[in-house]
Amino acid sequence: MIASFDIGIKNFAFAVKRDGEFVLVENVNLLGDFVTKNDLNKTPKSALVEMMDRLNLDSKGQIKKTMVESILTAQKKSSPKQRAIDLGVKLFETMDRYRSFWTECDTFLVERQMVSNMQALKLSHYLEAYLKIHYPDKSVVNYSASNKTRKLGAPPLPTKPDRKRWTVEYAASILTGRHLDKFQSCPKKDDLADVVCMIEAYQKM
């Protein structure tokens, strides 16, 4: 079995393939239920109305951006200061939930992060450390993202959006069943596509 990982705070994606078939395709938000003002402002009004109903607030079916901001401001003033989220701990907790898969894998692919993205780079180091501590006899590969499309025989793709579209289409063509359903319903398909394509490209080496 082989697993691949694409580091992200809100989109920590990973996949596992066994005997030619994907048995795990996941995308996890390491922040969990933590919601920022920007997150809420991007949320559809219908979802915000439901959220306000659950909070026993009178939304009257109408909601405006200022209402969202006032809710957040009121909550911030009335609640104690929140403890900062330790992303390293959240990463380890996520990995622990899927240990039944990791124990069966013999190879782990961790997508190489750009030096300019210090948060992602730090998390990738945490992930590699976790894998090497728990599975010292297994292969942990720091895998270059540039290998994916080239190894999979993609045509020249000059821009990043072009490469994202191609990998999404490629992943959709090989996933099946509930994993395809999950992929199609995911708003960030490119992250899931990355981990699927990483495995496919690595196995063509």
Swiss-Prot record:
Lineage: superkingdom: Viruses
Family: Belongs to the IIV-6 170L family.
Protein name: Uncharacterized protein 97L
